[in-house]
Amino acid sequence: MDKMLFSFLRLCFVLLTVWTTWVAADFALYENYDEDALIAGLALSSTCLAALNTTVTCNETAVGLLGHGADIHFWTTTDVNNLCTTDCVSSLSSWKDNVATVCAEETTIQGNVVVKARALPLTFTYNSDLVCMQDSSSNWCFLDSQTWQGSDYIRWDPTMCFTNGDDNSTVALQCADPDFDIGDISDDMAALTNLYDKELFCNECFLNLYRQRLLDPWLPVTNFTDYLIDQFDLVQANCSTTLPYSTSASTLYVGTATATTTTSATTTTDSTTTATCLGQMVQPLQNWLTCNDLCDTYNISTGDARVITGDYACYFNQATCFPLPCEIDTVWDTPSCDELATRYSNSTYSVTTAQFLSWNTNVQGSCSGIAAGQRARREKSAPGGTFPKPNATITAPGATGEPTYYTAATAAYPTQTGTISECGDYYLVVAGDDCATVDLRFGLNYTQLQEYNTYLDATCSNLWLNYDICVAPVTAQTVSTDVVILIMAARLQMESVARILPETRPALVLSLELVVPYLVIVEAPVTTVLGQTAIAVLPYQS
């Protein structure tokens, strides 16, 4: 349950991709969705939905950056100024309070997790509180934090118990103790006060941001959370400060969508959603596997493993559905996506970057240099027997801010008979998807989805796993001199922020909660950062 709580931040916001707009405007959670489809798909009352969909007086593009978590985006001063206006901060707070009152105890399914509807605004308000925090001199704390440098635990030198040939004088005295374990980390070795300079951990912004992260509404009840709390108390004692805080009770998470009853204020009969695993159902182990071990054992990519478990270390504590096994490759030397596409091509088929990304939708790192050490999916032969060669798709902003496709795309995966030929965009169906989740992801109603995929029956019982489904038609092009046209292949890349494996060097730690638990499995010294600047961390010398 704890890991499901923590994974909610990543899983639930497949609904919210419509925030990336072409012009600045006020923000509404479900602005482009059909109301009837939302009420049916989310199992919410019309009054709760109306409260959730209240227009918030914030720059829509700026608020959209909060949806996946403040740490995913590298914020500039302009970004912060666009978000942190008095009107926006006040409007977000009012929205949260109104949803809590109107939706009360109604529940909904987000990313196969049943949660309280009042939880949906909290990611925005919690992350806006992080980004908009200022110190007593009115400096933006979050901007400052992006330059802070982080550290792994202090560790024993891995060679301290080895002899130098016949010379035993190099062996440390501790090695003679039969109870000594070179992998043990003492409290002093893990203490934040020994990992950072006092000038940093007593910094006003450091303390306030640390405290704010402890107020995270999705902070799980785990040993690591206990560690964070203990370390905050230790830091405060060293800095002679007393900042009150209280962690959130785990009341927002209700359960998983499998065999779980969801209710709303207007529902008179119970509805049950049962998920079916069409991939590999993997049982958790007492001695859980690291990401690399999990991927090597079940032949899945590192990105898929992290997204499905919702955990950077790929920890899960209940039976979990992973994709079917495929051929994987261990990536070294931080190649670009283009270089990997070339590497995976053969004399018969030329793999494009778009195809590589369609196989690795959760690739770790930036496409200018993906994270070394991760397992990436590759294909000796194409899905369906051939490697399609997708053309670049020309897109432009439509009237509602949604992309408009002027040329037909080529599916990177097989499609079912009945998919329209003039399809502008495809989506790969993965485990856990149904027609409702696809509709919500792309702002469609079921009639539209059936129009683009005529084979779909009335109950969506014939949606096939690992097949592409059409999610947008081609629109007849009109002549315009006012629209800037963008050429897109598989997806937009965030070149400024790399999500990098913690097992490798350099590694990016996305937030303070992630600094330590994923580094304790690292046997070699690594480079870690709280913001974007990496430093080398040397092993502790005894």
UniProtKB/Swiss-Prot annotation:
Known function: Might have a role in sequestration of chitin oligosaccharides (breakdown products of fungal cell walls that are released during invasion and act as triggers of host immunity) to dampen host defense.
Annotated source species: Penicillium expansum
Superkingdom to which the source organism belongs: Eukaryota
Glycosylation sites: 53, 59, 168, 223, 238, 299, 346, 391, 445
Stretch forming the signal peptide: 1-24
LysM domain boundaries: 327-378, 425-471
SUPFAM superfamilies referenced in this protein's UniProt entry, alphabetically: LysM domain (SSF54106)
The keyword Signal is annotated on this UniProt entry: yes
Phenotypic consequence of gene deletion: Does not affect radial growth rate and colony morphology, nor lesion development on apples.
Note in the entry: In plants, chitin acts as a microbe-associated molecular pattern (MAMP) that is recognized by lysin motif (LysM)-containing plant cell surface-localized pattern recognition receptors (PRRs) that activate a plethora of downstream immune responses.
Gene induction: Highly expressed during the infection and development of decay of apple fruit.
Alphabetical list of InterPro entries matching this protein: LysM1-like, LysM_dom, LysM_dom_sf
Name under which the protein is recorded: Secreted LysM effector LysM4
Description of its domains: The LysM (lysin motif) domains are small globular domains involved in binding chitin in eukaryotes. LysM4 contains 2 LysM domains.
Keywords: Chitin-binding, Glycoprotein, Repeat, Signal, Virulence
UniProt record similarity statement: Belongs to the secreted LysM effector family.
GO molecular function annotation: chitin binding
Family annotation (Gene3D superfamilies): LysM domain
